[in-house]
Amino acid sequence: PMRLDVVLHGSSKPVGMSELKFIARFDEGDDAEKSAPDVDFIELHPLGRVENCYRWAGETDVFEAIEAVCRNYKIDRDRIVLRGMSMGASGTWHLGLKHPSRFVALGPYCGYVDTHRFSETPISNFIRVGPLPEHQERGLHMLDSIDYAANAAVVPAIAAIGDKDVFFQSHVHMGEVFAKEGIPFVNLISPGTGHVIDPKTHAEQMRRIGEHVAKGLDHAPRALRFVTWTLKYNRCHWLELLALDRHYERAELVANVSSNGTIVVEKAENIREFAIHPPMLQSPAAKFCIDHAFIPLPEPKGDTTRTLVFSKQGGVWKFAGSRASVALTGKRPGVQGPIDDAFATPFLCVRGTGTPWNHSVGAWADASLRRFAYEFARYMRGELP
């Protein structure tokens, strides 16, 4: 199986990246001689619909593209790297820190990491984002990568940037947050370089990424610390968060696994329900402890694929059952909001049939669907059947 590097592109001024413009970057013409690849891995360059740092539809595109490559090529899923430059680096911070168990290493090259401080970059067409209403400030916790910096303890990040880059402050900011989280920050600085990739610095970045690739992913870490602010980003290796006390507030779980498989949860902040996936808690000797109390577990009975759910009920943690048997209610993964998620996965449009009771309403509904079909095709590149 081969290593896969997912490379996210930067923004394109001034009108956005069209499909033809994007494909033209890789067109070598019709000459008989083609440039031979000088690497022993596959590179995937997703377009990512809408230039918003690979959020929403762009995020869906990245993961669907990865799955398509894995179907068509023999890819080692334990050696998938995520890297990018500029907006692509921002997407690398965003996707990598929020999906820390999906990638073996991250390689952001000069990318922004937050909303407020980035908006203060001294560029003429930038609009400074001042204080926002409380609900909007809370919503930023879903977007800003700095709020997920603690997850760099799960997926290593090797950042790089030029010391003359106008966005240099973004990496300074991320370094400050790493320090607060107690995580060393690797930031390779290219002297005298602006907002471009320096070949020498990039080579060192790739060398260090290669060291992590050689080790591969560890799907059963003995120590796990995972931070999120929304159930949209709820999975890290054998841990799956299922319910939070308060959305858009920091949720953190810290757990350690002993030699006999016993899990001790040291911290479960702003979390109401979570699941432990295999290979954890499969041994008869394994126990589960949270809030200094051991919770009785069912006998494995030879089942090595069971996923166990734990819920806080009346302020007390209890075993709730298997993942397949527990019915989730309220905000839950995939139905946690905001409404943008409805257009990031398959959805259903219902066409009117027969004769409408009210012809005016029927005409309005038909016109609305035609408008939606036009706009969805224009911006999201999707045709209604």
Where are these regions (language model features)?
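The feature captures the conserved acid-bearing segment of alpha/beta-hydrolase catalytic domains
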Residues: 121-197, 203-210
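Gly/Ser-rich "nucleophile elbow"/oxyanion-hole loop immediately N-terminal to the catalytic nucleophile
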Residues: 54-87, 97-103, 151
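Short beta-strand immediately N-terminal to the catalytic nucleophile in serine-hydrolase-like folds
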Residues: 82-84, 109, 160
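Alpha/beta-hydrolase-fold serine-hydrolase catalytic core, especially in secreted/extracellular enzymes
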Residues: 1, 172-176, 180-384
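Active-site machinery of serine-nucleophile hydrolases
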Residues: 2-73, 347-348
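The conserved beta1-alpha1 loop
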Residues: 8-10, 110, 161-162, 266
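Hydrolases whose catalytic domains are alpha/beta-hydrolase-1, hotdog thioesterase
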Residues: 91-95
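Mobile cap/lid helix-loop segments that gate and shape the active-site cleft of serine hydrolases
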Residues: 10, 16-28, 101-149, 154-155
